[in-house]
Amino acid sequence: NDNLEEQAKALFNHYFIQNTENLGEWQDGVLTDIAQYLNGLAMQKYPAMPNEAGLPVLKIKELGQGQCDTNSDRCSSLIKPEYIISDGTIIFSWSGTLLVDIWCGGKCGLNQHLFKVSSAKYPQWFVFYWTKHHLNKFIRIAKDKAVTMGHIKRCDLEISKVKIPS
């Protein structure tokens, strides 16, 4: 899988970063033009009720390890559906440890400090690689702000340039 990931990233970089003159009719945009970045909830405010199995909470730790486990917090399964994460969802940790990944760890609730990244207009690979393209810049921004936990702000997404089809 790592080899496939590297090949896909190399193709993306070749066509969308290094050789943009070959794109044809494309225009400049920013990350928020191609995707919605939904911030998670403070899940401690939505605990699983007594006698409710609830859902595991997706936090930065779980994203980094690729799964929830028996030590993961649990939240109510009655949270708004947009905060319930399923396999195949792009998740972007924007605070603390910054990373972008496609979640494959099962159904869970989206915690604060994580964005659910989705688009009704563009394919998932397109949104994923543009977000990932800006990750090192976001890490530098967060490091410069690190008093307690370094983070980026929504305005950083709003100025991160992308190429989009005309």
Show which residues each predicted segment covers:
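Short coil/turn segments at secondary-structure boundaries
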Residues: Q27, Q44-E52, I141-D144
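A generic structural signal for residues embedded in beta-strands
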Residues: I91-S93
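Sequence-specific dsDNA recognition surfaces
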Residues: T32-P47, G54-D87, C104-G105, G109-L110
